[in-house]
Structures are given as C-alpha cells and as structure tokens.
Amino acid sequence: MNQASSRIRIALSGRIETALENIYRKHNLTPINDETRQRLSSIPENLGFELVRKVFSLQAGLIYNLDSFIVSKVNQAVSFTGYPQPANSLSPSGRHVSRVLQEEMSVDSDAPSPKSLKSEDKGGSLHIPQLVALGELEFKKVFLLLSYIPGQHVGQVITADEIRLWKDLPMVEYEAAVWDRLGRHYCPQKDRRMLQWDSGKTHYYQCNVAPNGSYTFKVLSALQGPLLEHTGTHLHKVLGDDNVLTVKFADVQKSSSTYSIDHYFTYKGIAKNGIMIGLRRYQFFVFKDGGKEEKKKDLSTKKVKCYFIRTDSTAFYDMQNPYILTGKSIYEARMHFMHVHRAPTLANYMARFSLILSKTKTLEVDMTGITFDQIDDIHCHDQDGKDVLDKNKKPCIHSDGTGYISEDLARMCPLNIFKGKCLRSESIQEACYQDPPLLIQFRMFYDGYAVKGTFLLNKKLCPRTVQVRPSMIKVSKDPSLSNFSTFNALEVVTTSNPPKRTKLSKNLVALLSYGGIPNEFFLDILLNTLEESKSIFYNKRAALNAALNYGEMDDQNAAQMILVGIPLDEPHLKNYLSILLKTEKNDLKAGKLPVTESYYLMGTVDPTGALKEDEVCVILESGQISGEVLVYRNPGLHFGDIHILKATYVKALEEYVGNSKFAVFFPQKGPRSLGDEIAGGDFDGDMYFISRNPELLENFKPSEPWVSLTPPSKSNSGRAPSQLSPEELEEELFEMFLTAGFHASNVIGIAADSWLTIMDRFLILGDDRAEEKAEMKKKMLELIDIYYDALDAPKKGDKVYLPNKLKPDIFPHYMERDKKFQSTSILGLIFDFVKSQTTEEPSPSSEISKLPCFEDEPVSEFHMQKCRLWYDNYRTEMTQAMKTDKDESANEVIQRYKQEFYGAAGFEDSKKSLEELYPQALALYKIVYDYAIHAGVSKCRFVWKVAGPVLCRFYLNKKMQEKCLVCAPSVLKELWG
C-alpha cells in the first residue's frame, strides 16, 4: 500500500511545496496526506498557493490537524469563487477591473481572494534545500550571495547548513564570509560589493540578462551627496529597494548563437515568466527611456531603463513579513499607483506610468487631509473672444502644466531642490522661517490620478489645498474604482532656485548670430574668459571664481582651500585648477560662453491677468525687474524661438507669491501661449533663458515665431489598453520596451545635427547667394518641424521619419566627425580660437611637498598605522573600481570612505568633534602625500575629497589664526560673478 501510494503521490508546484515545508517547520506539524494533496491539486495553482500562504501566516499553535484545516479551506475557496466559472459577456479588461474592485472590498473576508500571480513555477525546481535555506535570510543577504556566484547554481557550490550558519551574522561579517567561501572563487575582485548596507541610502538591485537568458546580479548604492537625502523614485519608496529590480538586457546580435527569426524570444519568455532570485519572483513592470536629453545623444549611448518588481515569494523570511503587493497581479499592482488602464493608447500608457520613475523628494504631508481642487485651464482667445484651436482641433491654452499650492503646503517643501535632491541642508522648521519656493515642479499620485506639472505659490488659497488643471492630469481616476486603495504621494522634482552661472549653447549662439548679434560679441566674451582663466594659477580672485563656477565638481572643496588661505601652488590645488582650466576650455569650444545679466528661470503663467501679450514678469533675488528682456528656451532651433519682451512690474502678483523669488511669468492673453511660441514650451517645469544683456538687446532682431507646418496627428487605430486582456497588455508593453531599447531611431539627434550643419553654412553665405539660402532655409524649417514632432512622439505613439535628402554627408569641423569641412561661422571661429590658445599651464610638479602647517604637527603612531591600513584598503578598492563603471564606482568608493571617516555622509552631518577628526585627517594627509611623491600628484586628491573640510579648518586655526566668517557659496558667486 505504501509503495502504491508513493508511486501515485500527487505533485504540487514548487512554490506550494516550499510553503508547505515552511508550515511544517513553523507549526511543528507532520506533512499532509495524499488526499489533502489531491484536494489542493484540484483547484487553480495560484489559489492553492494563496491558501497555504495564509495558513503559514497564522499564529503558531492554532492548527492541530493540518489535513482537515486545509481541506476545509479548500472547500470554502471553491464555494467562494465558484470554480469552474462560466464565461460572461464582459470584455477581458472589464472582467479584470470588476474583479479587482470586488477583491479590494472583500479584503477582510476569511475566504481567500482569487488573486492571480500570472506565472507558474516550472516543476519542482524551487524545491531544493539550499534555496529553502536562502529563504530564511533577509533578501539583501540572498542577493549578495547570488551575485558572488555568477554562472553557478547555488545547489552545486554550497550546502544548506553552511548558509544557515551565516544567517545571523551582521552584514559586514556576512559579506566577508560569503566572499571568502564563494566570491573569491567565482567572482571577479572588481565586482565585490562592500557597501554601507545600513546607511539609509537607496540601493539599486540590478540583474544583467545575457542573450541566452542567463543572469548575473549586482547591487549599487545611490550616491546621494553630502546630505544623504532619502532621494529615490516613487516606485522604490513605495515598494522598498529590494522589491524593485533594475534589469539590463544585452543586445542580441545577428551573429550570436541565440539569433533567430524572433531575435528576442528568450527575453519575451523572461518577461512572461519572471526572474527568480532565490524563492522570489520578479516580473516586468515599467520602463523609461532617457528622456529628451538622452534622445539628443548618439544612439550607442541611449539607455532605456527596465524595472521588474517582486510579485510573489515562498521564502520563509518573506512569508513572515507582510508585502504590500502580495497576491496582486501586475495589472492590479499598476492600478495601485495610478489608474493607468484609462490611458487612450499604449504609448501614452507607458509614458504616463513611467512618472513613478522620476527622481523625487517626498513632501511629508498627510495626503488624506489635502483638498484636491480641479480648476479650468486658461484658453487662448482670438479677437472675437472665441477659443483658438490647434491643428488637431483642440483648444490652445495659456496655462499648460501649471497650477497652485497653498502657502502652508509650500512651506513644507525645502528650498533648493534639484532633480529630487536638496542642494543645501535645512530642516522643515528652518524652512518655516524663510519664504517658501515660488514654483514647485512635482509629480502627484492621488486617488488614482497621476498629475505632473508645477505648483505656483498662492497665498490666497485655503490651507492644505492644491489646484490642478486638466493639462496637468496625465491619468484620470476611474470612477468605478472608488474603493480601490492607491499609493498617494506628493513628490517634488525641482524648486525655483537661484540661477547658476548662465552660459550660451551652440544652438543659441547660431540663432543669435542669425538675428544680428555680431561675431565680436561672442569673441570678446571668449577672449575675456580665456584671459581670466590664464591667471587662475597666480590670481586668487580668478582662482576662486573658477572654483565657484565649477563647485559641483568637488563639493566646493577647492573654493574652501582658497578661502582659508592655502597657497595656489599647493600641489593638489594647483593640479585641480589645471583640471578646471581644461574643463573651461572644452565648454568654450562647445559654444558654452558665459553671458552676463542672464538667467535660467522656471516659467509659469501670470495668475493676475495683468500682463499684456508682449509682457513678462521676472522675479530675481532683488525682486521684480523692468525693461526689455530677451527670452529663449532650449533646445529651440527656430529663428523665432528668441523673443524680445517687456519685463513688467505687477504689484498684484505679491498677493500670490509674497517675497518668494526666481521665476518668469508669461501672460494669459493673446491667441497663442508665449511659452508655446518659444520652441513649443509649456509650464510643467521648463526653464527659460532670460537676458537683459544690453548688447544682445541692442543688436538682436527677432523673427516670426515658429508655427508647425506638419499635418495633424493621425488618430491611433490600435486598440486602447482597456480593450486588451492583462496578458495581451503585458506582451504589447514588453514589445514596446524591446523596440525602445534596441530598435529606436535617433531622429531627434540626427535632425538636430542636420539643422546645425545647414545653419552653419547658411550663416557664412552672403546676400548674393539668396536663392541658395532660401533653399537652405526651407530645409531647416522642415528639420525643425521633424525635430519638434520627434520630441513629443513617444507619448503620442507617433512615428517620425527623417528623409535622407535632409541628412548631410559632411559636417562642420567643430562637430568633430570623420567627414568634415572647415567652418568659418561664429561656431567654427570659437572652436579654432580656443584650440589655438596654448595657455601656459604649469606642468605637474615633479616635487610634491607638504604644507609645513600639516607636516610639522605631531600625530600619534596609532593614528598613522590606522590610516596607513585604511589607505592601503582604499587603493585596492579604487584600483578594482576603475576597471568597471569608472566614475560611478569610483565615486561610490569615495563616498563610502567619507561615511567611515565622519561616521556620517559628510562633514556637515558628522557628530564627531574637530578635536577627534584633526589627528585622523593629519595622519591621512601625511600618508597620502608620502605616497603621491612617488605615484603622482593626482593621488593627493583622496585626502582632500574625504577630509578637505577638516584640513581647511585646521589650516585656518593653526596657520592663519583668524576668525572664521560664514558665507554661502551663492553669495560668493554673486560677489565674484
């Protein structure tokens, strides 16, 4: 009888078998009998797994007879779900949404909900002792171990008992043990990851997929700057770092062994079945290309980021810890972020859903108490007061992308946020005593809505209120899902910040030249900038100016050194200044000329309605300005993308924004939005170039603004996402990812290069070549339309083509292509002039000496030995880091050593006293400089990157013996600008 029963033993899926083993162990119960196994196998696998998962989660000691308990639950489940279900008349997506709503409302029911995890386990491959043992560890330990055995199967390199021995080790000791036992045998040294796992940083878990479907793993730590802000994407913040997997698919070359008619058959299988990491499954969720800036680059550098998320897990550790998406399908999971199934097209679906991938800082506010007020857009009207329609017969609007936020909410937003990071340290309490940001670029996820744009401070609004317009709502709420929970958040991307040093661009130089700005204007700027650059090695004012202008390169380290009186010929400082000089020259060659009395400001619409059609209101540090200003927006190519407008004082604006600063307001009058006239701009965060430079205003002659000449957009004939079944939707979305990642055309970049090439030749032709110039202008206008259409094509699902007749065969020499001609346009002259300058840069010093102030200070042998070992470890790690990912890995190593040195992310956050830090900094200085004497001056960089603020304070107190004055870098820039 026993032999017969063994032969007909019912096989269950791998994840159910694993869950049952976890139940036996947790509840101290004997395995279920064959009859119970038969009952479990009679219901859908996903329902069976959900049932045993809930059994596992019960408190130990509550179950006395596992067989009868499971059978009763199976009977309840069958009764509740009514399997088998008859087909109904609803569409697949309609049934799905209806089921989701039903399940949300019955979440407290004792009967299990019929959630679908969409992917089946293959046989019992998961049911191996080593994977079960891994499942008892927290995930970061699992991932680290698997990343140290690339190409190996865990069951073949280690036993389950060995894994369990490491279970309770602290992460540092665990990493060392795993590396010693496994990593050094199977993993390159450069891939060793000794991260600050408990530092609070965002960690990015990465999976690299080869064409044959094999995986390797890697974990990266987000570099969040000196303040260690918790910055990340909405996706990572909601689910947690370890539940989001960045997946990089290698391109499949035709010559590879995996090449077939369907080149990406293997990848599609992975998208369908998911990626197993231990006993966790991750499935395709969202992708995002590099945005407009990325599209302008060469296609070989194009990056499309693909993210999988954790769906289910049979790991013992995971089953003991609640997960917000347990039992949810991918379709359902997306709806918890936004009701994206309402998107009209597939292209729009993913373009809007990828808003959850913006790098943001969360506004810490109770979203349940916010008043979410929808207001109308401001329409453009003709002389008769009628709505003006665009080429697609939609109303033109003045308020595209901008709404309002109440003062109390705005005050909760820190000042100086840029791309989700705080540029300076300040608490919310400190911010309450300052003027709030005037404009806030944001992403808002609220009750199924996804909103994108800017909030203008409105002191007139009731507290805890935001007002959004239809142009800001990218995904609207599904009324049928009123009881469906969503991950609500107000995420800040950028605030209206003080302008940085403003530079021109190649496009802007070309357009200004076309508009009548003489070559002498640009060449004078060039000459003056180069002259000042030459003096940075002996003129402290020039050196400080350069250090401040490029302060983001070294966290203002060089500026600190200069300000405390360290000589300019100090080896590291002298070497760094030469790097700045090279950087400045490269910028100048690319047309990035610094221009005075010019600013980049975030734009919005005038809330008062006071501005006339040709007026703007500009608010700078000193308040509103008056007079003519030149206005432009990158990446404008059209001759009319540069406007001359009148900056006007608007008293009534103060009632809205008070004393908040740094923005440009456009009028809400006229038949067309001024923002749209300037390179198709809007007000969802676009930055506008504003200049009151007298030479530009005196000489520039504006042209008629751009008007699109391309035909209306074709209506999308494909099925809407809501008409697809969840399975069909996933297939279509992953196909879109493959196209974007491996087959996207680079129309934007090629069109921009083609335009610049034709524009370059156009600028040097005389009036006697009128016919030829007219033909060239016609081509440029075609390219401009193609370029602007291509910028918006992804979210519309349009395909934009660039005719070969518009592509040049030869390019200006300053573009540094293989096929080139010698350009004599202003851009060619700038390039040649910079290249011809043989600036007398000091050669690297063959004799590196220490500053007496540091060398003569006694340091204990204890600190010297400690720092010597520390520096040896650093050099080993940095050598390995430079073999891969160079800048990224090198910065990560530096940041890790700063963390260790200060016990915090940087000097500003350290709780260590200067008396504690001084001996360590001095010891490190002596050791590093002794090494640099033989290895080269570039090796001095490490001690200044890590301990620079401490050394500067020691020098100031010991050498200068002067009182320290506190000064903000922005004030110094203003004084030296």
Curated annotation (Swiss-Prot):
Keywords: Nucleotidyltransferase, RNA-binding, RNA-directed RNA polymerase, RNA-mediated gene silencing, Transferase. It is an enzyme of class 2 (transferase). One of its GO terms (molecular function) is RNA binding. Its EC number is 2.7.7.48. Pfam families: RdRP. GO terms for biological process: regulatory ncRNA-mediated gene silencing. Coiled coil: none annotated. It comes from the Eukaryota. InterPro entries: RNA-dep_RNA_pol_euk-typ. It catalyses: RNA(n) + a ribonucleoside 5'-triphosphate = RNA(n+1) + diphosphate. Residues 103-122 are annotated as: Disordered. Probably involved in the RNA silencing pathway and required for the generation of small interfering RNAs (siRNAs). Belongs to the RdRP family. PANTHER family: RNA-DEPENDENT RNA POLYMERASE, RNA-DIRECTED RNA POLYMERASE. This is Probable RNA-dependent RNA polymerase 5. The lineage of its organism: Eukaryota, Viridiplantae, Streptophyta, Embryophyta, Tracheophyta.
